[in-house]
C-alpha cells in the first residue's frame, strides 16, 4: 500500500504504464473513445475582422464537417438561421472529434525540466470519465481536500511577505491533507497561476515529492498548442511566451493539465463549466472507505476581477455550499470582498457611508460606471448574506497565522456538518491542531467530560452491540438476541441528553478506531485526553479488526501467521486472537506462554464466537489466568464454569491492560511511533519495552531468513534497539530514584507476560546492556553471594569452607532485610525464623554501639542456619560443583591412561556414577523447566549450546561404557570412545571460565571464531579440492579405484597449507626415494638411478605440478589464511569492545543455573533428587497448593500483593513521565534545537520589523496627507480672519501676524499681498511657500534656497525704470548681492523696499526685525543651498526674508502652467523659508543635505531675478516715485473681489522710498544655485504621486502687479505693454 502511494505520488509515468502492449492499446482506445475535442466547422465572419470567424480562427483554418456526423442541430438550419443572424454558438457551429492530444509534457526553458500529464477534452466532458482517467490512468489517489484557486488573470504584484505566507500556507495545507490544487493552468505575467506556480516550484526544489497541482485551462488560450498534438506521446513544451501574442503558456510547476476545448481561439470561458462540474463530482467521492465524508472543496480567492466575485457567489449558492477563503491585501476583488466582509452585518446589510465608499472603490478599481458598480455591489451583498461561509485571511491578524489554518478552519466552520463528521475530516487530514482548536471545545453541542460518568452501563451496552456488525460476517446473528436483553433499558435512553452523550461517546470511540487504523498517533493522544476510556473501547472484535486491517504501513503479520499455521492462507483469511497468540509464542520463544492461547481464553472465545453461542455479542475481557487444574474432572468442571460465565458482567468484558494489547498490535503491525506512544501509557512499561524489543528482534530475524528486502530487516532491528534503549533508560531513571524499588521492578512477577520477570525478558531478548546495568548487577551479586557477606577473596573463603567445614562458622552472614531478590514468602519465613532465634538466644544484659548490635546479629544466627545458608549460596554451589568436576576429570584421566581390565575398577565406577547422576540432573532440568509441553521443554533446553555438548558427551560415554563391559574387541572400541569423549569433557571446562571477568569474554570469542572458521573452511575446501584433484590426476594417471584416492587428494595439499611442501624427501637410511611424496621425481626411458635401479617412465605433464602448487600455496597459504586472521581480528575487537557486557550477561546465565541446582554435586546429587521426589509426593499428599506454586516459580521472582503492585506501577509511571520530561528538556537545550528556535525567532522578528516598516511608511503618508489638509484648513482660517477683519472695519496696518503656511491652491501674488498686509508697520516680511521641508536658516549674508516656487505662476511687478527694458526671468534661487546693480536685461525685475537700513527701530514695531552686525562665527550653510554666494561681498547687516509660495495640487492647474511637452517631476507640499532683517532665527538648515540630496533634482535651467530690497519709511519719498498702472489696479481689485474679501486700499501716499542706492540691497536669483534643491512635489490624499510639467515660456511674460503697499515694482516696459501682458495672464482664484 505504501509503495503504491509512492508510485502515484512520484511522477515517473514510464514505470507506471502497463507492462503489455495489449493493455496499452486498450487504454489508448478507451481514451480516444471517451474524450473528444471541438472544432468550428461553420464560418461566421466577425464584425471586427471579416477574415476571421467569430470563434477566433481565420476562415481558411476551418475544417469541413464530417459527412457522417452532423451537429446537434441540422446544418441547414444553422446556416440559414444563425449564420445569417451572425450569432455564433458552440453547440451549433462546432463538431466533436476524438481527442488527438494527450500524453506527457516536458517543460523546457525554466532552468530545469519538469514533466506533466495532459489531455485535450471537450468542454462538456462527463466529470466521472475525467475522474476515472485521473485515478486509473494517471495513478492519482483520491484527494482528502480540493483547493480551487481563483484570481486575476492579468499580472499583479503581491507584497513579498504576503506572497511568502500565501505560498507556504497553501503548500502546507496541501501537503498535510493530501489535497489537490485546481488552478487556471496558464501563466499570464504575474497572474495568480504564476504565484501558485512559484510556491509549487519552491516546494518541489526542497522536497522530493510533488504536490498534485491540476491546471484546467482553455485549449484556445494555450500558446504553442500545436506542439501538444499527438496520441500518447511525450512532447517538449517551451515555456517562453511570445510578447506579441495574446495567448498564454502553461505553467511548468503543475503536474497535470486538463485542456478544455469549445472550438474557440483566444477566448476564455471554455474551462469554467468543466471545472465546476469536476469539482462537484469530486466532492461526492468518499475520502476513505472507513470515513463516510465526501471530499471537501474550498475556494481560494487571490486578487481577481468582477468575474471572481461571480464565482464566489456561485460557490456560496451551491448545494451544499462551498466555503471560500479570501486573501486580503492581494488587491482588487479580494480587497473589496474583505472590506465588505469586515464591515457588513449579518444578512448583507452595510452602513450607508460605507456603502458609498464601497461603491466609489468599485468604480475606481474596475473603472466601472455607476450602474455597473451598483450591479457588482449587489452581487457582493448577495455573497455577504452567507457571510459565515466566507473566511478572510489577513496577514498579521491575531486569529490566523497562515493560509492553511484559514483554509481548514473555513471548511470546518463553513460546512454545516456534525461534530463527528468534523472530527472525521480532521482525522482524514491528519490535522490534530485543527481538531484541538476547532472541535474539542465545550459548547451547547459538546458535553463536558464529567457528564460521561452516569450513563456508563447504557453506553457500554449500546456501543458493544454496535461495533461487531462491521467486523465479521457471522457476528450479525448475535446482535438481534442481544437487543432482546437490552430492551429493558430503553427507558433510560429516552432522555435526549443521555442519547446525545451516548452518540458522542460512540463517535469518539469510532474516531479512536479510525485513528488507530490510519496510524494517527496525535489523534489517539488527543482522544485519550478528551475522555475516551480505553477499557471501554477495546473489545475483541475491535482488536481483531485492528489486526486484519489493510491500511497503514506494510507489515509481515500474514507471513508470520502462515509460518505458524504451516499452511497457505487464503487472501481474505481472518486473523483471530488465537492466531496472534501462536505468533507471539513463536516470536518470543523459550517458555513464553501467551494469554491468547491459554485454555481459559480459548474456551471463552469459542463460547462467544463459536457455534455454541451467538457470534459478536459483547466485549471480552481478559482476567488473570489461573494455573491449569489437573485431572479430567477438574477440567470438565472448569469448562462448565467458563460456559456459564455471564458475558454481560463488566468485570469479564474488559481487558485488564488494554494498552498492553494495543502496543503488541502496533509492534506486530510495524507501527513504531504508535508503539512508542502506547508504551508510555498504562502499566508495566519496562516489561512492555523488553517485550517489544524481543518481538522486533525476532521479526527482523524472520525477515532476514525469509529473504525479504534488507531494509525491512534493518528497520525492525533499529526499532528493537530503540525499545531496548527505552528499557535501559527507564531502569536507570528508576534506579536513581530508589534502588530497592528498582530491584523490585526487575524481579516481580508479570502476570500479563507469561508470569515472567523483567530480567527473564531481558535475557530472552539478549539485551546485554540491560543485564549489565548497575541495578541488575547488584541484584545478581546479592543472589550470587546468598546470605554470605564477603568483600575480598570470596572464592578462597568458599573453598576453605568446602574443604574445611568448621571455617563456615567464622564467615559473616546477612539478615533477610538485606535481601533484594528474595520472594515475599521466603523473606517472611526467614524473618519468622530469625525472630524466634533472636528471642531464644537473647542475652539478659543490654549492649551498646553498632558493632555490638552487629555482633549480636551474627551470634544470633544458629549454626544450622549458617551451614544451610552456606551450602545454598550459588557461589558455594559453583565451587562445590567445580571441585567435583575437576575430581571427575582426574579420575577419568586415570581410567583411560592406565590399562583397562575386564571389570571396571573403583575409579571407573565413580566416573560412571558421576555421568549417570549428571544425566539424571539434566533430565530434572528438562522436566522442571517452564514450558508446558514436553516437546517444548526439550526444544527450549536444546537452545543452550552447553546442553548440546553435555548431551553428546553423556551419550558417547554411555555407548563407550556399554561397549567397555563387553569382551574384546568391543571393549577396545569402548576404550577408544572413552578417549574421544574426554575431549568434550575438557571443552566443558570453558563453561566454568564464564564466571571470570577476564576469561569469560574469551570463551565467547572462541565460539564466534569457530562460526567464522566454518565459513572459511568451505572456501578453503574449494581451493584445496581444485589443486588436489589436478595434482593426483597428473602424477598418478594409472591409479585403480580405491578409497585411498580420496585420502591422497587431501593429504598433501592440506599439509602444504601449514608450510610442509614435501620437497625431495629421501629416507637416508634405506636410500629409497619416496616418489609419491616428491614434486618432480626422476624418471626416463632406459635410465637408472645411482643404485642401478631402473627409473620409471616420465609422466606427461608432470612439469605442471610445481606451477599449480605455487599458485595453490599463494592462494591458500597467503590469501585465505590472512583472510581468516583478519576475520578473527575483527571478531576479537568486536567482542573486546563489549567484553564487560558479555561477561555480565554470561554471569547471569551462570548464576541462574547454580541458583536452581541442588546443593550436592554429582554423584552425590542423587540424594538431592531423592529429597525432591519425597517432598513433592508429601506435598501432594497434604494437598498443598503452595507446593506447586513454589516449585513452578523457583528462581529470581518476587510475589507482591495487589496493594504493593499498585504502588510499584505508580512509581514506574512517575519514572516514565520524569524520563520523558528530562528528555524533552535535553532536546530543547540541545544546540540544534536552540539554533532552530533562534532561526524561527529571527525570522519572526524580521517579519515584524517589515510590518513595522510598512506601518511606518503608511503613517508617514497619512501624516503628510493630514499635514496638507491642515495647511489647507489654516489657509481657510486665514481667509476667514481676513474677511472678519474687513467686515469689522479693522485697519490692517495695525495688525502684525505671521502665517507659516498657505494653501497649496493660492496664487503667488495673493501670498505677496497677504504678506504685505501682515507687515504694514513698515518692516517688510516676504513670505514665499517652497515645496520642501520647513527649513529656516540664519546666514551671514542674505541667501535663500532656490526659488522653485516661481515655477508655479508668473508674477509681474512694477519696476523702476533703470534700463531700457525690464524682463521677468525664471527664478531659481535667491542671492544677496551687496555690490552695484548689474546691467538691466529685458524683462528683469527688481523688488524695492523703501527705507534706509540704518533706520532705528521704533517702539511698537516688530521686535523680531532689527539691524545687527554680521557674526563672522555664524554657521555658514549657503554652500549647500546657494553655492555661488560670495561671502567677501556681503554687507555688514543681517537680513532675513520669510518667503512663502504655494502651488496648486490639482492636475488641471499644474497642466495649465506646465504643459505636457516638458519634463515631468514630482511635486511636494508647500514649506517655507523665512528671512528677516536683523532677526536671529532658532531654526536652520543643519540637515539640508542629508535629507534632500537624494531626492532633489534640477528640473530646468532658469535665468536670474534681481530684486532690490529697501526699507520703507512712514513718509513718502520723492526720489522713488510710486507708479501704479491701471491694469494692475484693476487686477488687484478683481483678485480681492474674487476672494469675497473687501480689502481696503492702502494709502500709498504715506510710503516713501529712501535715497539709499539700490545696489546695496539687491536679491538675485541665479540658475546655477538651484542644484540640490527639491523639485516641486505633491501627493494626493491617497498618497499617489502626481506629475506636473514646467513651462518656462509662460514664466517669461509679465504677470499682474502686486497689491502690496510696501512693494514698488518698476518696469522699463511701456505701461500698455504691461497691461496687455497682465491681461493675458489672469490669476486663478485662491
From Swiss-Prot:
It catalyses: Ca(2+)(in) = Ca(2+)(out); Mg(2+)(in) = Mg(2+)(out); Mn(2+)(in) = Mn(2+)(out); Ni(2+)(in) = Ni(2+)(out). It comes from Rattus norvegicus (Rat). GO terms for molecular function: calcium channel activity; monoatomic cation channel activity; monoatomic cation transmembrane transporter activity; monoatomic ion channel activity. This is Transient receptor potential cation channel subfamily M member 1. Residues 1-877, 966-975, 1030-1107, 1180-1630 are cytoplasmic. Inhibited by extracellular zinc ions. Inhibited by intracellular Mg(2+). Activated by the neuroactive steroid pregnenolone sulfate. Negatively regulated by activation of GRM6 receptors in the ON-bipolar cells. Constitutively open nonselective divalent cation-conducting channels which mediate the influx of Ca(2+), Mg(2+), Mn(2+), Ba(2+), and Ni(2+) into the cytoplasm, leading to membrane depolarization. Impermeable to zinc ions. In addition, forms heteromultimeric ion channels with TRPM3 which are permeable for calcium and zinc ions. Plays an essential role for the depolarizing photoresponse of retinal ON bipolar cells. One of its GO terms (biological process) is protein localization. It comes from the Eukaryota. Residues 69-92 have a biased composition (Polar residues). Residues 8-25 have a biased composition (Low complexity). Residues 474-485 have a biased composition (Basic residues).
Amino acid at each position: 500500500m505504501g509503495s503504491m502511494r509512492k508510485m502515484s505520488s512520484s511522477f515517473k509515468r514510464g514505470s507506471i504504464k502497463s507492462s503489455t502492449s495489449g493493455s496499452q492499446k486498450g487504454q489508448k482506445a478507451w481514451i480516444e473513445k471517451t474524450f473528444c475535442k471541438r472544432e468550428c466547422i461553420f464560418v461566421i465572419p466577425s464584425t471586427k475582422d471579416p477574415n476571421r470567424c467569430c470563434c477566433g480562427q481565420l476562415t481558411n483554418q476551418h475544417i469541413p464537417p464530417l459527412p457522417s456526423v452532423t451537429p446537434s442541430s441540422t446544418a441547414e438550419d444553422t446556416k440559414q438561421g444563425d449564420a445569417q443572424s451572425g450569432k455564433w454558438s458552440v453547440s451549433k457551429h462546432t463538431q466533436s472529434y476524438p481527442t488527438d492530444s494527450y500524453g506527457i509534457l516536458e517543460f523546457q526553458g525554466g532552468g530545469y525540466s519538469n514533466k506533466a500529464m495532459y489531455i485535450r477534452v471537450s468542454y462538456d466532458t462527463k466529470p466521472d470519465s475525467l475522474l476515472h482517467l485521473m485515478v486509473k490512468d494517471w495513478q492519482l489517489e483520491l484527494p482528502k481536500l480540493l483547493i480551487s484557486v481563483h484570481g486575476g488573470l492579468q499580472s499583479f504584484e503581491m507584497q513579498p511577505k504576503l506572497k511568502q505566507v500565501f505560498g507556504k500556507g497553501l503548500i502546507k495545507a496541501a501537503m498535510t491533507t493530501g489535497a489537490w490544487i485546481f488552478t487556471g493552468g496558464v501563466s499570464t505575467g504575474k497572474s495568480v497561476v504564476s504565484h501558485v506556480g512559484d510556491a509549487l516550484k519552491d516546494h518541489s526544489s526542497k522536497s522530493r515529492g510533488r504536490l498534485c497541482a491540476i491546471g484546467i485551462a482553455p485549449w484556445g488560450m494555450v500558446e504553442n498548442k500545436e506542439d501538444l498534438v499527438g496520441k500518447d506521446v511525450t512532447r517538449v513544451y517551451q515555456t517562453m511566451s511570445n510578447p506579441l501574442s495574446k495567448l498564454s503558456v502553461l505553467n511548468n510547476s503543475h503536474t497535470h493539465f486538463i485542456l478544455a476545448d469549445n472550438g474557440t481561439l483566444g477566448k476564455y470561458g471554455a474551462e469554467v463549466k468543466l471545472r465546476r462540474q469536476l469539482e462537484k463530482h469530486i466532492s461526492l467521492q468518499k475520502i476513505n472507505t472507513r470515513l463516510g465524508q465526501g471530499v471537501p472543496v474550498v475556494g481560494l480567492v487571490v486578487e481577481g476581477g468582477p468575474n471572481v466575485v461571480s464565482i464566489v457567489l456561485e460557490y456560496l449558492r451551491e448545494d451544499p455550499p462551498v466555503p471560500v477563503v479570501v486573501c486580503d491585501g492581494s488587491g482588487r476583488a479580494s480587497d473589496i470582498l474583505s472590506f465588505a466582509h469586515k464591515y457588513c452585518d449579518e444578512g448583507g446589510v452595510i452602513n450607508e457611508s460605507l456603502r458609498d465608499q464601497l461603491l466609489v472603490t468599485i468604480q475606481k478599481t474596475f473603472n466601472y460606471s455607476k450602474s455597473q458598480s451598483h450591479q457588482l455591489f449587489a452581487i457582493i451583498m448577495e455573497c455577504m448574506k452567507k457571510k459565515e461561509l466566507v473566511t478572510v485571511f489577513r496577514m498579521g491578524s491575531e486569529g490566523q497565522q497562515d493560509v492553511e489554518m484559514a483554509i481548514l478552519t473555513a471548511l470546518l466552520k463553513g460546512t454545516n456538518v456534525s461534530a463527528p463528521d468534523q472530527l472525521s475530516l480532521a482525522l482524514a487530514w491528519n490535522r490534530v491542531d485543527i481538531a484541538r482548536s476547532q472541535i474539542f471545545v465545550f459548547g451547547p453541542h459538546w458535553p463536558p467530560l464529567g457528564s460521561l460518568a452516569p450513563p456508563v452501563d447504557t453506553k457500554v451496552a449500546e456501543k458493544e452491540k454496535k461495533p461487531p456488525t462491521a467486523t465479521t460476517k457471522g457476528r450479525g446473528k448475535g446482535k438481534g438476541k442481544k437487543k432482546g436483553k437490552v430492551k429493558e433499558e430503553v427507558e433510560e435512553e429516552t432522555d435526549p441528553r443521555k442519547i446525545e452523550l451516548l452518540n458522542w461517546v460512540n463517535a469518539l470511540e469510532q474516531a479512536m478506531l479510525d485513528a488507530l487504523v490510519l496510524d494517527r498517533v496525535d489523534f489517539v493522544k488527543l482522544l485519550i485526553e478528551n475522555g475516551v476510556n480505553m477499557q471501554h473501547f477495546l473489545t475483541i472484535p475491535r482488536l481483531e479488526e485492528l489486526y486484519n486491517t489493510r491500511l497503514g504501513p506494510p507489515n509481515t503479520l500474514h507471513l508470520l501467521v502462515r509460518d505458524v499455521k504451516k499452511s497457505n492462507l487464503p487472501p481474505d483469511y481472518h486473523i483471530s486472537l488465537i492466531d496472534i497468540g501462536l505468533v507471539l509464542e513463536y516470536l518470543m520463544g523459550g517458555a513464553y506462554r501467551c494469554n491468547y492461547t491459554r485454555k481459559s481464553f480459548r474456551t471463552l472465545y469459542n463460547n462467544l464466537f463459536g457455534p455454541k453461542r451467538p457470534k459478536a455479542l459483547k466485549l471480552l475481557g481478559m482476567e488473570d489466568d489461573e494455573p491449569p487444574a489437573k485431572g479430567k474432572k477438574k477440567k470438565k468442571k472448569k469448562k462448565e464454569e467458563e460456559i456459564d460465565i455471564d458475558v454481560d458482567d463488566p468485570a469479564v468484558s474488559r481487558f485488564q491492560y488494554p494498552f498492553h494489547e494495543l502496543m503488541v498490535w502496533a509492534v506486530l503491525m510495524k507501527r513504531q511511533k504508535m508503539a512508542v506512544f502506547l508504551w508510555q501509557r498504562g502499566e508495566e512499561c519496562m516489561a512492555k519495552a523488553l517485550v517489544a524489543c524481543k518481538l522486533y528482534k525476532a521479526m527482523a530475524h524472520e525477515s532476514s531468513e525469509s529473504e525479504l528486502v534488507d531494509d525491512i530487516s534493518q528497520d525492525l532491528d533499529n526499532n528493537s534497539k530503540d525499545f531496548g534503549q527505552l528499557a535501559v533508560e527507564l531502569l536507570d531513571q528508576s534506579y536513581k530514584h530508589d534502588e530497592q524499588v528498582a530491584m523490585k521492578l526487575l524481579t516481580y512477577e508479570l502476570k500479563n507476560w507469561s508470569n515472567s520477570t523483567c530480567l527473564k525478558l531481558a535475557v530472552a531478548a539478549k539485551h546485554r546492556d540491560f543485564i549489565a546495568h548497575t541495578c541488575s548487577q547488584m541484584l545478581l551479586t546479592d543472589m550470587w553471594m546468598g546470605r554470605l557477606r564477603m568483600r575480598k577473596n570470596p572464592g578462597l573463603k568458599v573453598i576453605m569452607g568446602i574443604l574445611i567445614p568448621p571455617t563456615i562458622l567464622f564467615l559473616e552472614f546477612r539478615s533477610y532485610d538485606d535481601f533484594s531478590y528474595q520472594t515475599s514468602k521466603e523473606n517472611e519465613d526467614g524473618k519468622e525464623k530469625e525472630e524466634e532465634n533472636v528471642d531464644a538466644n537473647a542475652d539478659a544484659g543490654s549492649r551498646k554501639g553498632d558493632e555490638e548490635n552487629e555482633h549480636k546479629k551474627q551470634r544470633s544466627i544458629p549454626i544450622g542456619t549458617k551451614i544451610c545458608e552456606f551450602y545454598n549460596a550459588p557461589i558455594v554451589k559453583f565451587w562445590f560443583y567445580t571441585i567435583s568436576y575437576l575430581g571427575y576429570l582426574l579420575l577419568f584421566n586415570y581410567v583411560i591412561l592406565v590399562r583397562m581390565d575386564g571389570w571396571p575398577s573403583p575409579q571407573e565406577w565413580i566416573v560412571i556414577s558421576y555421568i549417570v547422576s549428571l544425566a539424571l540432573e539434566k533430565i530434572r532440568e528438562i522436566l522442571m523447566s517452564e514450558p508446558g509441553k514436553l516437546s517444548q521443554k526439550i526444544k527450549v533446553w536444546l537452545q543452550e549450546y552447553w546442553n548440546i555438548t553435555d548431551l553428546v558427551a553423556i551419550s558417547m560415554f554411555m555407548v563407550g561404557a556399554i561397549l567397555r563391559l563387553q569382551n574384546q574387541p568391543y571393549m577396545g572400541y569402548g576404550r577408544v570412545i572413552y578417549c574421544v569423549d574426554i575431549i568434550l569433557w575438557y571443552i566443558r571446562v570453558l563453561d566454568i571460565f564464564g564466571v571470570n571477568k577476564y576469561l569469560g569474554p574469551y570463551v565467547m570469542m572462541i565460539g564466534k571464531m569457530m562460526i567464522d572458521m566454518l565459513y572459511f573452511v568451505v572456501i578453503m575446501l574449494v581451493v584445496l579440492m581444485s589443486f588436489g584433484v589436478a595434482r593426483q590426476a597428473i602424477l598418478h594417471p594409472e591409479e585403480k579405484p580405491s578409497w585411498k584416492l580420496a585420502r591422497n587428494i587431501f593429504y598433501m595439499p592440506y599439509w602444504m597449507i601449514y608450510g610442509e611442501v614435501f620437497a625431495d624427501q629421501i629416507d637416508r637410511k634405506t636410500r629409497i626415494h619416496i616418489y609419491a611424496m616428491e614434486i618432480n621425481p626422476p624418471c626416463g626411458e632406459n635410465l637408472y638411478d645411482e643404485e642401478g635401479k631402473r627409473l620409471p617412465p616420465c609422466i606427461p605433464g608432470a612439469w605442471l605440478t610445481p606451477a599449480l602448487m605455487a599458485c595453490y600455496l599463494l592462494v591458500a597459504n597467503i590469501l585465505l589464511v590472512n583472510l581468516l586472521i583478519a576475520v578473527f581480528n575483527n571478531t576479537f575487537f568486536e567482542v573486546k569492545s563489549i567484553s564487560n557486557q558479555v561477561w555480565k550477561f554470561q554471569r547471569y546465565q551462570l548464576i541462574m543455573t547454580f541458583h536452581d541446582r541442588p546443593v550436592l554435586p554429582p554423584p552425590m546429587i542423587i540424594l538431592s533428587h531423592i529429597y525432591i521426589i519425597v517432598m513433592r509426593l508429601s506435598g501432594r499428599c497434604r494437598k498443598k497448593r503452595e507446593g506447586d506454586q513454589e516449585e513452578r516459580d523457583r528462581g529470581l521472582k518476587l510475589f507482591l500483593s495487589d496493594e504493593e503492585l499498585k504502588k510499584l506501577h505508580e512509581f514506574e509511571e512517575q519514572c516514565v513521565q520524569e524520563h520523558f520530561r528530562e528528555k524533552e528538556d535535553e532536546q530543547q537545550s540541545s544546540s540544534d534545537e536552540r539554533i532552530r528556535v533562534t532561526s524561527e525567532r529571527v525570522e519572526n522578528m524580521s517579519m515584524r520589523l517589515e510590518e513595522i516598516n510598512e506601518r511606518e511608511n503608511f503613517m508617514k503618508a497619512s501624516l503628510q496627507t493630514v499635514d496638507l489638509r491642515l495647511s489647507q484648513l489654516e489657509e481657510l482660517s486665514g481667509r476667514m480672519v481676513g474677511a472678519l477683519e474687513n467686515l469689522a472695519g479693522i485697519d490692517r496696518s495695525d495688525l502684525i501676524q505671521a502665517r507659516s503656511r498657505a494653501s497649496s491652491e493660492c496664487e503667488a501674488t495673493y501670498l505677496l499681498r497677504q504678506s504685505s498686509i501682515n507687515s504694514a508697520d513698515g518692516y517688510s516680511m516676504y513670505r514665499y511657500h517652497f515645496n520642501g521641508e520647513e527649513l529656516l536658516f540664519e546666514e551671514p549674508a542674505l541667501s535663500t534656497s532656490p526659488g522653485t516656487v516661481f515655477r508655479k505662476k508668473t508674477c509681474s511687478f512694477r519696476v523702476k525704470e533703470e534700463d531700457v527694458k525690464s524682463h521677468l526671468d525664471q527664478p531659481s534661487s535667491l542671492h544677496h548681492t551687496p555690490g552695484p546693480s548689474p546691467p538691466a536685461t529685458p524683462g528683469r525685475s527688481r523688488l524695492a523696499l523703501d527705507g534706509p537700513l540704518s533706520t532705528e527701530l521704533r517702539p511698537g514695531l516688530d521686535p523680531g526685525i532689527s539691524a545687527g552686525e554680521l557674526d563672522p562665527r555664524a554657521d555658514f550653510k549657503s554652500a549647500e543651498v546657494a553655492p555661488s554666494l560670495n561671502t567677501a561681498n556681503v554687507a555688514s547687516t543681517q537680513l532675513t526674508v520669510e518667503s512663502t509660495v504655494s502651488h496648486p495640487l490639482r492636475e488641471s492647474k499644474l497642466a495649465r502652467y506646465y504643459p505636457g511637452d516638458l519634463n515631468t517631476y514630482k511635486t511636494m507640499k508647500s514649506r517655507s523659508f523665512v528671512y528677516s532683517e536683523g532677526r536671529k532665527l532658532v531654526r536652520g538648515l543643519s540637515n539640508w543635505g542629508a535629507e534632500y540630496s537624494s531626492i532633489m533634482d534640477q528640473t530646468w535651467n532658469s535665468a536670474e531675478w534681481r530684486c532690490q530690497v529697501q526699507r520703507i519709511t512712514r513718509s513718502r519719498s520723492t526720489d522713488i516715485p510710486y507708479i501704479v498702472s491701471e491694469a494692475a489696479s484693476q487686477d488687484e481689485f478683481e483678485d480681492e473681489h474674487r476672494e469675497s474679501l473687501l480689502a481696503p486700499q492702502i494709502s500709498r501716499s504715506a510710503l516713501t522710498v529712501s535715497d539709499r542706492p539700490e545696489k546695496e540691497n539687491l536679491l538675485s536669483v541665479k540658475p546655477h544655485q538651484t542644484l540640490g534643491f527639491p523639485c516641486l512635489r505633491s501627493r494626493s490624499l491617497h498618497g499617489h504621486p502626481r506629475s506636473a510639467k514646467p513651462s518656462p515660456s509662460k514664466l517669461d511674460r509679465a504677470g499682474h502687479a502686486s497689491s502690496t503697499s510696501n512693494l514698488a515694482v518698476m518696469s522699463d516696459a511701456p505701461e500698455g505693454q504691461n497691461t496687455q501682458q497682465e491681461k493675458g495672464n489672469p490669476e486663478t482664484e485662491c
